[in-house]
């Protein structure tokens, strides 16, 4: 273990101080948003606040704190001992990025999210359906403010997704402007951000059975 000399003997900074030091170096004495899991609320984040304010002589540390709830796997808490850890590299190899984004946005960040096959399948079917109203749009096409309102309300992603469903229904029966609004609202959160052809290629590639699985 690395250590340094001190008046009290050899020692090293604890993890609370490590985070305060990194925040000060890269973000400054005060910054806007600090995130982390709900399990870090106490004692880690409270210690960060106390020592950073004292060291920097400031009244605040971070202006806003966003604590996310846990992701479970089939209603079980993720744990290495259980062998049910969700690795990002595995997701990238098996799940299209759009499906992954929609799945993660399906619950508010403060609420637990259960990761299971049904969630992924439902999100894949939703994306597939939404591509029925896909339209190439200009990059500077703006999303109407009223559509964005849920995101202003403590990042209410389920509320925003509900708006996307309403926009899809309108786009399906409407004109090109309705479709453009729908697509721009989807692309604002990283959905429908590839061409319809690319999405179809992804579907086909996932539908093919590898030869080694046949033999």
Language model features by range: what are they?
Residues 1-139:
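Alpha-helical recognition segments enriched in aromatics with Gly/Pro capping
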Residues 77-215:
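Structural preference for alpha-helix termini/caps and helix-kink/transition segments
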